[in-house]
């Protein structure tokens, strides 16, 4: 059964052009905690969508449930796999970096998904997670408009505290949290600043490290 992401993949992809400064702001925030990816490091974006973030951030692999989105992602030279986050088709300890951007709100089973992230990460591997904070003004706006948004209609937005609890349970230790998007999206004409912490910005990025006591 095709989802809205399959039926409207091009529309979804065009959002990043129509909101280029919002996209730029999110990229800057992610880069602040992601850092440079070395050629020998294996990296993957879970919920890669149409590959916008992966392409610019030099993420080699991408995974998504939408076959139509992955067709666009492949054009951006990302190695693609169709699967769900709760059942990753990769060997344990196979990636140095995992990126997830606005994916947490679509997870059917967050506990299982983050356990899978832990499994595929190498010891000291890094998860970088970008999210819309449910408790922010942006998060409240998205929730209010959910019924009319074909992409977020069935999303469950989460707070930073909720995500932190999921990470803790999966033995993923938080290292850094930053935030951006302090104004309504329609008012953003230049890249927004990035601040440490959360509670002000609508878009929050958390970095977490796989704990060393991996068995």
What is each stretch, according to the model?
Residues 1-38, 52-53, 69, 126-154, 181, ...:
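Conserved class I S-adenosyl-L-methionine
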Residues 155-177:
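Short alpha-helix
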Residues 44-87:
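Class I SAM-dependent methyltransferase SAM/SAH-binding core
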Residues 190-215:
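Core SAM-dependent methyltransferase catalytic element
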Residues 99:
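A conserved beta-strand element that flanks and buttresses the S-adenosyl-L-methionine
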Residues 102-105:
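Short catalytic micro-motifs in class I SAM-dependent methyltransferases
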Residues 111-123:
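A short glycine-rich, Lys/Arg-flanked "PGG" loop and its adjoining helix->strand segment in the class I
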């Amino acid at each position: 059964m095709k989802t809205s992401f399959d039926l409207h993949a091009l529309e979804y992809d065009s959002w990043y052009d129509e909101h280029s400064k919002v996209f730029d702001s999110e990229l800057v925030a992610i880069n602040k905690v992601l850092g440079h990816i070395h050629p020998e490091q294996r990296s993957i974006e879970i919920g890669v969508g149409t590959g916008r973030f992966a392409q610019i951030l030099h993420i080699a692999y991408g995974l998504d449930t939408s076959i139509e989105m992955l067709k666009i992602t492949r054009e951006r030279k990302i190695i693609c796999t169709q699967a769900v986050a709760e059942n990753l088709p990769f060997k344990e300890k196979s990636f140095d970096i995992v990126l997830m951007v606005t994916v947490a709100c679509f997870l059917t089973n967050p506990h299982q998904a983050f356990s899978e992230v832990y499994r595929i990460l190498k010891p000291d591997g890094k998860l970088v997670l970008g999210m819309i904070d449910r408790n922010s003004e942006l998060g409240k706006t998205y929730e209010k408009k959910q019924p009319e948004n074909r992409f977020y209609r069935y999303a469950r937005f989460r707070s930073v505290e909720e995500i932190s609890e999921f990470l803790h349970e999966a033995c993923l230790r938080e290292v850094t949290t930053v935030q951006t998007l302090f104004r309504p999206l329609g008012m953003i004409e230049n890249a927004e600043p990035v601040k440490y912490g959360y509670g002000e910005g609508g878009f929050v990025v958390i970095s977490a490290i796989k704990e060393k006591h991996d068995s």
